[in-house]
Regions:
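Pair of pore-lining "gating" transmembrane helices in MFS-fold secondary transporters
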Residues: 15-35, 227-240
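Short amphipathic helix-loop junctions that connect adjacent transmembrane helices
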Residues: 38-52, 247-261
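Central cavity-lining transmembrane alpha-helices of secondary-active solute carriers
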Residues: 60-73
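Conserved MFS/SLC helix-loop-helix module at the cytosolic interface between two early adjacent transmembrane helices
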Residues: 71-92, 97
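Helix-breaking motifs and short loop linkers at transmembrane-helix boundaries and internal kinks
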Residues: 102-104
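Cytoplasmic helix-loop-helix junction between adjacent transmembrane helices
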Residues: 116-146
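Helix-loop-helix hairpin linking two adjacent transmembrane segments in secondary transporters
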Residues: 150-194
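Conserved small/polar residues in nucleotide/adenosyl-binding loops
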Residues: 265-274
Length: 275
């Protein structure tokens, strides 16, 4: 039965291999994120930003990039497909991490952090869209395993960050190593990604597009109250998470005055708890 389903969906590879390939993309995203989070105090010291307000403005460019990418991600995934966008977004995410390590002034750092936020959200949308397609292939829910893999990779990334700090490796070489590792992962796993399967016929899609006209006014429509409520809950959840990742290391170092190598054991503990 599974072989028939694979043939129907046009899959040339075993579904287990497809699943593990998709898992590797989630692992790459988690590794990229925690690599940045583990070196935030070092990057701050490199640019000698002594005022928390100014540093907060710099870090704020990441969520700004994520916000800008919300409509962009949906459009690109719908037009290009999640298969292409998953590859582009993960490679772009790794490239943005590498660029952060090369920044030689605070303005370039801000630009790279903005791009980091954009590709972060592109990864979220495209990878989860691919995951939904693989769930259809399996006929059951497996998304939790992908998200668990993300957390496991984030934990591993924090451990690597700990080793890099103890060894005196600069953020540039740290980020370069991670970017190369992610690039190899994408090149190896990309062929197993699946094309999006249309859930509507072409005629139904054309009819839906006609109903959505005029497109210029469609974004003005009032959202449902449930959507607003969920958005508010998500906003506060992200505020707490951002405070944890962006500022805890600085708090441990500047207030509690513990070594950098020790300050990021809390990040590994937090990621382990998520997993």
């Amino acid at each position: 039965m599974n072989e028939k389903m694979n043939a129907t969906l046009g899959n040339a590879f075993p579904k287990e291999r497809i699943r593990y390939a998709m898992l590797s993309f989630f692992l790459a995203q988690g590794l990229c994120f925690s690599s940045w989070a583990s070196r935030i105090p070092d990057v701050k010291d490199i640019f000698e930003v002594n005022y928390a307000f100014y540093w907060g403005l710099v870090l704020f460019l990441i969520p700004v990039g994520k916000f800008v990418a919300i409509p962009l991600a949906g459009y690109l995934v719908s037009k290009l497909g999640s298969r292409i966008m998953a590859q582009v977004s993960v490679l772009g995410y790794a490239l943005a991490l590498f660029a952060i390590g090369t920044a030689h002034n605070i303005y370039l750092l801000g630009v790279y952090l903005f791009c980091f936020g954009v590709f972060w959200n592109l990864c979220d949308i495209s990878l989860n869209t691919q995951g939904i397609g693989i769930e259809r292939l399996y006929g059951r829910t497996i998304m939790a395993s992908f998200h668990g893999g993300w957390s496991l990779a984030a934990c591993l990334g924090a451990l690597i960050g700990f080793i890099m700090i103890v060894s005196g490796v600069t953020p540039f070489w740290h980020f370069t190593l991670i970017a190369l590792l992610i690039g190899v992962t994408v090149l190896v796993s990309r062929k197993y990604l699946q094309e999006d399967v249309a859930v509507e016929s072409p005629e139904e899609e054309k009819e839906a597009e006609k109903k959505e006209a005029p497109a210029l006014l469609s974004f003005i429509r009032k959202p449902e109250m449930l959507l607003i409520q969920l958005g508010i809950v998500g906003l506060f959840a992200l505020v707490v998470e951002s405070a944890m990742f962006d500022w805890s290391g600085l708090y441990f170092e500047s207030v509690l005055q513990v070594p950098k190598s020790v300050s990021y054991t809390h990040l590994r503990a937090h990621e382990t708890d998520q997993y």
